[in-house]
Amino acid sequence: MNKEKRLKYAMVGGGKGSFIGPIHRMAIRMDDLADLVDGCYSHTDDWRDLIARCRGKIDFLAVCTPNSSHYEITKAALEAGMDVLCEKPLSMTLDEATELERLARRKRRVLGIPFTYSGFPMVKLARDLVKRGELGKIDKVVLEYSQGSFRKIDFSKPLDKRNAWKMDPKKAGPSCVVADIGVHGFHLIEHVTGLEVRQVLADLSSFAPGNRLDDDASMLLRLSGGAKAMFTVSKVATGEENGVRLRVYGDKASLYWNQEENNYLSVKYPFAPERIYKRNAPYIGDLSAASKALSRIPAGHHEGFIEGFANIYREFCAAVRDRKPHDFPGAHEGVRTMRFVEAALRSNKNGNRWEKV
């Protein structure tokens, strides 16, 4: 049981049939951080009534709805004096995301976004190894996020609601794959390397029958410091499940992290043996206090997605409680990802030209 005062929260969306709603609830319960005291789980319910009746009675609101309502719900909650953790993307447009960032700052509210992979212990180790110069100067990054989820759908039948809204521009916005999972990869690149993506050249495609939005993207990136990146993201990668694979190449060493084997991190050197770091091994604390702090169970017992999600919530709830900065993705990261989404869309529309992020 968490000895700190338990928080109270409400949730919009994430009801029956939702994938992400139960993930939020399980993640919060993992550390006994907060109690769910109210909710609005169906489109037939009015989230405005929820915000009105919860004003001054909850510590934060979790927004787990489709993309189209992220902005208006988050804005209303911030204006009502609530802290908010909103599902990605933060909004449907860069202008909306920027407005929410400014509103949160003006209202002195905590605004978080669950870019889950930054909550994984070995991602923190990767970030800290880069920070301490283990890889040297970063020259190249390769990020792959491959899912085959759209290959499992029978498009001759009505789509289930979990997939249907992601292909509907009115609910998903102008992008499917880049805004849905591409933002995770973008955030992972910037989080681990400490570099900013400055430009993008994007080639977006729609292969799934009837999909009006992108379900596959091949992109080149230019990063601060002169580094370059290759970034591919897909929902039509046949046979793949959730293949997030990150490679970072420096002039001294390189690293490799695979989400499907996320308890390990590989570092390679030109004139020395490869090192395989294991999550929560005895030496980890000396290399990365953050990685050690995020590990929950002994090495050899695998942790994964829900634990990573719970780590985001643990940091977010700490910020809600003590009103100090903590290590979780916030409004700034939400704005950065929307800058990237819009730049990728412009590049694709303008003949695959380089666009500023």
Regions found by a protein language model. Give the residues of each.
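Rossmann-fold dehydrogenase core element
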Residues: E99-Y117, K137-K140
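Beta-loop-alpha module in the N-terminal Rossmann-like domain of NAD(P)-dependent dehydrogenases
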Residues: H43-L103, A310
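Glycine-rich, aromatic-lined ligand/substrate-binding cores of catalytic
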Residues: H184-L188, V192-S254, Q259-N263
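N-terminal Rossmann-like dinucleotide-binding module
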Residues: M1-S42
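C-terminal helix-rich "cap/oligomerization" subdomain common to oxidoreductases
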Residues: M1-R6, D49, F60-A62, A272, ...
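Hydrophobic residues in well-ordered beta-strands that form the structural core
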Residues: C86, M92, L111-I113, W257
